[in-house]
Amino acid sequence: MDSEKVIKRDNEYVLHTYNRNPIALAKGHGLYAEGPEGQKYLDFTSGIGVNSLGYCDLTWAEAVSEQAHKLQHTSNLYYTAPCGKLAKKLCKRTGMSKVFFGNSGAEANEGAIKAARKYSFDHYGKGRDVVITLVNSFHGRTIATLTATGQEVFHNYFGPFNEGFVYTTAGDIEGLRELVDRHTCAIMLELIQGEGGVMALDPEYVQAVRALCDEKDLVLIVDEVQTGVGRTGTFLCCEHYNLKPDIVTLAKGLGGGLPIGAVLLNEKTAEGMGPGSHGSTFGGNPVVCAGANVVVDRMDQSFLANVSERAVQLRAGLAKLPMVKNLSGIGLMVGIEFFGGIQAADVLAACREKGLLVLTAKSRLRLLPPLTLTAHDVEKALGILNEVLTEMEQKAPKEQA
């Protein structure tokens, strides 16, 4: 089926909740996606940070296929080997005690909120249930995680929202301290605000938040849905901050392309979550976990060193491009701000026409390439971006540059 028919059918029958790019994708290999007519795209989006190993990694695909031919689903009424293997690997890699598996980042964050409130209820009783999150945060699109999201643009139309969430500005530790009262149970944050513009938090602020949580016995939840599993050059972004959260959430890159969410809990937050406290029919699915096991196994020291090296190469190249004002993020989670009237959406469209797929986040261009990229892949992407930005620079008024 050609692209036009694929797009037409989708527009006719799929709910229009996405502002899709006007292209269809049919298959992929490595860092390249291919359309029905054979047009190729160098993909620096990874399906929004999901395809950690690129498209159709052979070892990953074989593991998923092999498990699908053995046992595709059981529910959590029974034990399966892939689920337990993955949980053990995650605990050993992160120092956490237990893992709960769901199907998405939003579901993982819901589970984290529940676990934090359960800990507080068990130790302090009813009424200590407020979670503090950051302005410009993004934690999901369910009602609870949408309420946790500190961006008013996401709060239109869907009220009434859940009680129990308040917001503070990143970096303002005194403002945060003033918000904490006898009703507060947790502080929840992203170390890099992905949908908020790819903005990394200040390390001193993060350590001050940890200290405040220790002082007040608050649960510190770190949302690593987008930053986790090698994206920043370490298995968790927490490692860059020398941070030990009480709960960490993972999703996107963990499954390598299949839907998964994970709540990683330390001993104190795990102990109260007994049978019936939470659940997910599809959580810990053996096929998905088989793929995730391959992803986690791949994240050895050599692999992560290459991620860091490619990030240095990419950022150094981006800094030399015309119209680039500054860069944000950590590792291979990159935000690009432009001078003057250059719009990230226009850069995205122009890159797509030249065969490079990229993302936006607020006013910035966002790059989330597969973690398997090579030096050649980086240079090719930089070449396309250079072409696009040079053309835009020539058209822009001189004072904008």
Where are these regions (language model features)?
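Conserved N-terminal phosphate-binding loop of PLP-dependent enzymes in the Aspartate aminotransferase
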Residues: 1-401
